[in-house]
Regions:
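Anionic-ligand binding patches
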Residues: 38-184
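Short loop/helix-cap segments at secondary-structure boundaries that form the rim of catalytic
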Residues: 15-18, 35-36, 57-58
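Single conserved hydrophobic/aromatic residue that forms the stacking wall/gate
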Residues: 1-9, 13
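Cofactor-binding loop segments of dinucleotide-utilizing enzymes, especially the Rossmann-like FAD-
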Residues: 7-8, 28, 110
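Glycine-centered loop/turn motif at secondary-structure junctions
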Residues: 19-20, 184
Length: 184
């Protein structure tokens, strides 16, 4: 169950209270392969919505947040790499280039469901073959969209960010808290 925040409180109080609200992490059984979309941003919003509603159905009365992130390289979606070669392929494509990171967030209380997508443009410095090989030999790229963790070693490759850093990490915190306040 979810601990609520008094609706009589000011928005500032609500937002501060959300940092201390108890929550439980639930893994969704949503089948991501069923989702089709015209754009990477639409895809990630539908994935977040599917995950959110799958968990919401199992936890009636709870406020559920679902989220997903994809890396968009000229319209090609980079999810989590499936192999070392896949990780290297993604990193070569990101090297010295700009790409978009889209994070979809969906919140539902079982009655009402709202969602949004936040996007951020990221530019990497050129990466050497040795850097790519070394990074692909670590565990870091394999559970991350686009084969990199911006808060990890990939921070060294960062030339420019246009947008919310937390969108790249997978949860645009301030926008999520603003939307979550509507459910409290």
């Amino acid at each position: 169950s979810t601990q609520g925040v008094s609706s009589a409180a000011s928005d500032v109080y609500k937002r501060q209270s959300l940092y201390t609200t108890d929550f439980t992490v639930c893994v969704s059984d949503f089948d991501e392969s069923t989702v089709q979309a015209d754009t990477p941003a639409q895809l990630v919003e539908q994935l977040a919505r599917g995950k959110c509603l799958a968990v919401s159905a199992q936890h009636p009365g709870a406020v559920v947040i679902g989220c997903d992130t994809v890396v968009d390289v000229n319209g090609e979606v980079f999810g989590k790499p499936h192999s070392t070669e896949d990780a290297k392929r993604m990193l070569r494509a990101l090297s010295g280039a700009a790409h978009e990171v889209h994070t979809g967030v969906c919140i539902s209380d079982g009655t009402r469901t709202e969602s949004f997508v936040d996007s951020c443009r990221v530019t990497f410095f050129p990466l050497s073959g040795e850097e790519i090989d070394f990074y692909a030999s670590t565990a870091e790229p394999y559970d991350k969209a686009g084969a990199y963790a911006i808060q990890g070693r990939a921070a060294l490759w960062l030339d420019r960010i246009e947008g919310d850093y937390y969108t790249i990490m997978g949860l645009p915190v301030s926008r999520t808290v603003q939307l979550l306040a509507h459910f409290m």
